[in-house]
Each structure stands twice: as C-alpha cells, then as structure tokens.
Amino acid sequence: PLVSALAVMLLYLSIVKVITHWRGKIENFTDVSVVFGGAVIGAMTFAFTDSHWFNAVEAEVYAFSTFFTAIVVWLILLWNEKADENGNERYILIISYMIGLATGLHLLNLLTIPFVTLIVYFRKYKFEWKSFGITMLITAVIFFVIHNGIIKGLPKIAASSIGIYGTTLLIISIFGFMIWSVLNKQNLLSIISCSIVLILIGYSTYTMIYIRSNQDPVIDENDPETLESMISYLEREQYLSLIHISEPTRRYS
C-alpha cells in the first residue's frame, strides 16, 4: 500500500507539472484551482481505479512496478524544467538507475523509454520529420540494448562458452570505459556509459534470486540454481505461451 500511495503522489506531482507547463506560471486563484484541483482529481481517480487498488492490497510486483514507472515520469518532467541548468544530467542518470532497479522487478518500466526520449527531443530540438525519425531509431536502439543486450543478453553470454569470468570481464570493461570517459571529460560518452553502468547496478538485484535459490529455501519456485534455469526464469518460460482461439471454451453468465 505504501508504494502505491507514493505512486499516486508522484502522479499528482506529474500532473501539476504538465498543467503548469501548458498554462504557464500560476498567478491567481483560478490558476491554483485548475492546476492543483485538476491534479488532485486525476491522482485520486487513478488511486481508486480497480486495477491500481487491488495491486496495492496484494503481495505482487505490480505496485512497486507502478511506483518505478511514476518516479521515472516525474523525474523526466523535473529534468524538463531544469534542462538548461548546469548538472541537469543527474536526472538522466537517476532515471537510468530507476529503470535498472525496475527491470529487476518487472519489465513494465521499459515502456517509459519512449516517453523519456520524446521529452528530451521536444525539449532540446525543433520538430522535423528527419530528426524525429532519428529519435525514434535511437529509442529502439536503447530499448534493444536494455532488453536484449542486458536483461536477456548477459545471462546468455554467461551461459555460453565465454562463461561467467568472460561476462565479468565484459562488465569490468564497461566500468573502465565509464571511468575513462569521465576522466577525459567526454560528456556524451560519459552520460551514456554512466547510464549503462547504473542500469547494470540496478538490474544486478536479480543475482539475489540466483544466490537465494542455491541455498535451497523451502519455497524455491522454478529452482533457478544454474545459469540455464536462471535464463528460463528470466525469460518467463514458466508462464508458457498464450494460445489464441476464435471461440471461448468457457462462457460466463
């Protein structure tokens, strides 16, 4: 319930920022009523929706996942306000870490990536079809790197002939490149490399599953003790595939 309440709070703050950006600076009571009243109505409507309410009261991943999604949205809107200030990159970095933590919980947060890149694009550039297309291509690359490269790729690399030691060396190399880019003041490269490292640090929470499973606890679903079983666990193979049929096999009255 706590993280669900925090998600509602972050939604309220995000709506305040969106309305303020649209209407401009708050100057009178009417502005106060529209901005804060609209944000309260929007946040409370979401709070009492059936899906969010029942996610809040059950022990599942969706409440935390919603919280991480809400905080990423709020952070990029906060960055939008401070994009011209020195040190605005810190918001991009904390967003990267939040995405890493979130993917260690549920993949829903990956859907915030297009939102983040579009906010950055419209804040920094004037709309043109060519630049917009390039932005969409970059968005797809970022999604592919995180989903296929880090989330699915690293475990498969570790299970391949390269092994755990080779994967560890690869991760150390990424850390080394990050340090080099920061020390040599390569601004764009340092932001990219730091973001990748922060995503890796956040995603590393999955190692807890692997370590805990090897201790053979009483409840050990899917038993991800080996790299092969861990890959199966990460790819959600236990849920099988959904078979679509034209007619329902069971009808409800």
Predicted features along the sequence, with ranges:
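Transmembrane alpha-helices of multi-pass, membrane-embedded glycan-processing enzymes
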Residues: 2-11, 16-19, 23, 45, ...
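Hydrophobic transmembrane alpha-helices
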Residues: 8, 12-16, 50, 69-81, ...
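Membrane-interface transmembrane helices that cradle and orient dolichyl/undecaprenyl
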Residues: 19, 23-33, 72-91, 118-129
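Transmembrane and membrane-interface helices of multi-pass
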Residues: 35, 39-48, 143-150, 170-174, ...
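Membrane-interface alpha helices of multi-pass inner-membrane proteins
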Residues: 42-44, 91-105, 139
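Short acidic/glycine- and proline-prone juxtamembrane loop motifs at membrane-interface regions
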Residues: 51-62
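Perimembrane helix-loop-helix junctions
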Residues: 80-81, 112-196
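Single conserved hydrophobic/aromatic residue that forms the stacking wall/gate
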Residues: 243-253
